[in-house]
Amino acid sequence: MYFVGGILSFFVCLFVSSIDLNFLNKKERIKVSIRNIKKYYNLINFIIIFFVNLYLISLFLNNNVLYIINLLCFLCIYICSVTDIICKNIFLDIILSFACPIIFFNIYGNYIKISVFGLISGILLYGIIYILSRLFYGMEAFGIGDIYVLSLIGLSTDWYTVFNIGLFAFVIAGIFYFVKYIFVRKLQTFKHQEIPLVPFILFSYLILIYF
């Protein structure tokens, strides 16, 4: 299973590194090109994915099912972080392509009850916050794509963990953009700026799950 995880990590790293970021930004669609792999900043993708994979192996050395579930969840959030930063968009087909094998391994490892409860909790909790923010403030506290990502985390963990990850992500994002506002000082521009939340969700996920 660890060998499969290594192969999967390698191909996801190639996929992320081959994404045409300019095309993604302009068209909000994913286009891959072998030429992009050569760009120097893709070394960051390799370093992050490689070391997280190694840490997951050490963390779940005696449970390869939990290893592959957590690896799939991490890789999905990582891809979504890239698309969220570049075009402020989360692609549902990417979420589903990782959710299906996560469900399979949850059934295989007999974690399905915990994962389903975590999934439902993530959808209900953040769905209610999303709806209430639209009703009372006329704006979204976060996007539907963020709910997809948090629901995937719920499917991979449990209700308590997904709640803490979401809360920590909001706090970190709030601090980051407060500091940014201090330097920008343009309130109108800042108020209408879309905030990519998934990178903060990824950061919170790595901190709260693995450290």
Where are these regions (language model features)?
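A membrane-topology feature that recognizes alpha-helical transmembrane segments
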Residues: M1-F211
